[in-house]
A protein has these predicted regions:
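Periplasmic-binding protein-like
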Residues: 46-52, 96-97, 159-166
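N-terminal glycine-rich anion-binding loop in soluble enzyme alpha/beta folds
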Residues: 1-35, 103-142
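Glycine/small-residue-rich loop that forms an oxyanion/phosphate-binding "nest" at active or ligand-binding sites
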Residues: 36-81
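Short, acidic/small-residue loops that bind anionic groups at enzyme active sites
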Residues: 65-87, 178-197
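Active-site/ligand-binding-proximal alpha/beta "capping" segment
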Residues: 147-163, 168-185
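Short, flexible loop segments at boundaries between secondary-structure elements
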Residues: 128-135, 182-206
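Conserved beta-alpha
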Residues: 71-132, 215
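Short, well-structured alpha-helical segments in soluble
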Residues: 30-44, 145-159
Length: 217
């Protein structure tokens, strides 16, 4: 909502995620897609955004978007594809990736990005609570800590951009501060997903205050 231009409404539904109950929680979460699709389609949206990076970071992200679009009947974009497309917009080939994930998830996302032409120079998991190892409390990462780690790693000369991966991690206040500090583009799952959704919907309004990506058309 913070990024929404005047006249745009945002409607949500949620897929339940029970990492402490299932060995493959992302697969179990995706099993709820038919219900969630019905719920969001009841609002007659122009476009649907799939807000989970880890579960959408697979293979060719555009192919996965096409698959979801067939299932939903509406143009559908994903967080993982949005990050890849945002990096293309920045002409960024070498990145630092900051996440609140367990290292095993970072490793999977590193493979995903490298498979899509992006070299992950360094990744870091910010873990402040053991519950994060079960994908809980991702939204508890302090903004000051996120800024500090992003600036520390992102200022390296061989880094083109910084990504903050995880739709549940608060990032919008941090992005402009990090960009100002390192003089390089910064994007996050939430920011990139919103950018891809509104641009796909034909909304070209520049949006100030949440990073350089949303100023671009």
């Amino acid at each position: 909502w913070k990024m929404a231009p005047e006249g745009l409404t945002v409607h949500t539904s949620r897929m339940p995620f029970f990492a402490d109950r299932f060995d493959s929680p992302f697969d179990e979460m995706e099993s709820h897609l038919p219900r969630v699709i019905d719920e969001v389609n009841s609002a007659q949206p122009d476009i649907i955004a799939y807000g989970c990076t880890a579960s959408s970071a697979k293979g060719n992200p555009i192919d996965y978007e096409k698959q979801l679009t067939q299932n939903t009947g509406k143009p559908t974009v994903t967080a993982a594809a949005a990050l890849v497309e945002a990096l293309k917009t920045f002409s960024a080939k070498k990145i630092v990736m900051i996440t609140p994930y367990p290292q095993s998830t970072n490793d999977k996302e590193r493979v995903f990005f490298q498979g899509n032409g992006v070299e992950v120079i360094e990744d870091e998991s910010i873990i402040i609570d053991d519950a994060q190892l079960k994908f809980k409390n991702m939204n508890k990462i302090p903004t000051d800590l996120l800024i500090d780690r992003s600036v520390s790693l992102g200022q390296a000369e061989n880094v083109d951009a910084v990504i903050l991966s995880c739709c549940d991690m608060p990032t919008l206040d941090a992005i402009p501060i990090i960009e100002d500090a390192i003089g390089k583009p910064v994007t996050s799952s939430t920011q990139a997903l919103f950018w891809r959704a509104i641009r796909t919907a034909g909304i070209l309004d520049p949006i100030e205050g949440v990073g350089s990506l949303l100023i671009r058309t």
